């Protein structure tokens, strides 16, 4: 655990980090996190390629260690925590779940499905009156985009636009883009926390994109699945006339200088914590910030 000071990153004993072997940019390595007590801290975060073949539900050990050098001449060798994918089923027979965590309303639904649109819209309207609320997308694998737009309409009482542009290369055309050259921000006096995890995919990632233009929104958890637009596109090969399906028929373009999303890597959260602990730690952080 580290804190960021005017002198740089310091560990729990007050020792200042001067370098980490192999990582010259400390600000790129150290990410905001939340301590067990609910305070903002920093941890080094590394992303590694993973196989999603069923073993992602098992615990995995990162084989890379970090050697940290301090100003007093001492060193530490850090080993990453084990990792496994998080998914939480809804209560039996329910499409949605609106619960309370330390007095904060938390809304979970695992699909953007128009068949229970009234439930999602009703929860959004109820959450719009709360000073702090959480939208739990850690187990949401996507669905219909219009459900996401309606959710934000009910929550913020206005249209919320995304920041990026989706562009189809088969054939070349815009799929979705802001209605103006400069995407308008949506005002929001309350705090909306969006919980993210590696199961957050497709429309759940579009929802996170929308949240970037909503005031006082905060993404807490892990990087997402990275499959917002990697749908397959049907094409015909010009010479053989064979019909094939190819992925990446659509590309997602972020504003120049921003790299918050990348296909197969996902969205980066504002605050990195294990998905399983995100709801509890977010509630503790909000309590400490009162």
What residue spans do the PLM features occupy?
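Flexible, low-complexity junctional segments that flank or bridge functional domains
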Residues: 1-132, 139-141, 288
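Sec-exported extracytoplasmic/periplasmic mature domains
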Residues: 19-22, 125-129, 153-160, 200, ...
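Solvent-exposed loop/turn segments at secondary-structure junctions
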Residues: 24, 111-115, 139-145, 198-202, ...
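Structural recognition of the beta-strand scaffold that forms the well-ordered cores
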Residues: 105-108, 133-136, 191-196, 218-221, ...
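Extracytoplasmic/secreted envelope proteins and their assembly/folding machinery
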Residues: 117-124, 148-152, 192, 204-208, ...
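Gly/Ser/Thr-rich loop/hinge elements
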Residues: 141-191, 229-241, 248-254, 260-266
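Extended C-terminal subregions enriched in glycine
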Residues: 191-213, 218-226
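Low-complexity, Gly/Ser/Thr/Pro-rich intrinsically disordered linker/tail segments
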Residues: 260-290
């Amino acid at each position: 655990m580290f804190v960021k000071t005017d002198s740089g990153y310091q560990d729990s004993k007050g020792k200042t980090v001067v370098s980490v072997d192999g990582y010259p940019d400390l600000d790129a390595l150290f990410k905001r996190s939340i301590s067990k007590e609910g305070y903002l801290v920093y941890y080094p975060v590394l992303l590694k390629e993973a196989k999603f073949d069923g073993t992602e539900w098992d615990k995995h050990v990162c084989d890379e260690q970090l050697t940290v050098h301090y100003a007093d001449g001492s060193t530490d060798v850090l080993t990453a925590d084990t990792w496994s994918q998080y998914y939480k089923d809804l209560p039996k027979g329910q499409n949605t779940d609106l619960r309370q965590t330390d007095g904060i309303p938390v809304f979970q639904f695992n699909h953007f499905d128009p068949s229970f649109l009234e439930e999602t819209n009703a929860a959004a309207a109820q959450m719009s009156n709360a000073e702090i609320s959480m939208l739990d997308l850690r187990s949401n694998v996507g669905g219909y985009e219009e459900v996401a737009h309606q959710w934000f309409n009910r929550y913020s009482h206005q249209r919320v636009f995304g920041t990026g542009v989706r562009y189809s290369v088969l054939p070349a055309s815009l799929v979705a883009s802001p209605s103006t050259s400069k995407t308008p921000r949506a005002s929001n006096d309350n705090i909306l926390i969006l919980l993210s995890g590696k199961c957050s995919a497709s429309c759940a990632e579009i929802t996170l994109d929308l949240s970037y233009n909503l005031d006082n929104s905060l993404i807490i958890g892990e990087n997402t699945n990275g499959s917002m637009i990697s749908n397959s596109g049907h094409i015909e090969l010009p010479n053989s006339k064979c019909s094939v399906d190819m992925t990446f028929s659509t590309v997602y373009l972020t504003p120049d200088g921003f790299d918050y999303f990348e296909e197969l890597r996902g969205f980066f959260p504002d605050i990195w914590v294990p998905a399983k602990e995100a709801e509890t730690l977010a509630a503790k952080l909000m309590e400490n910030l009162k």
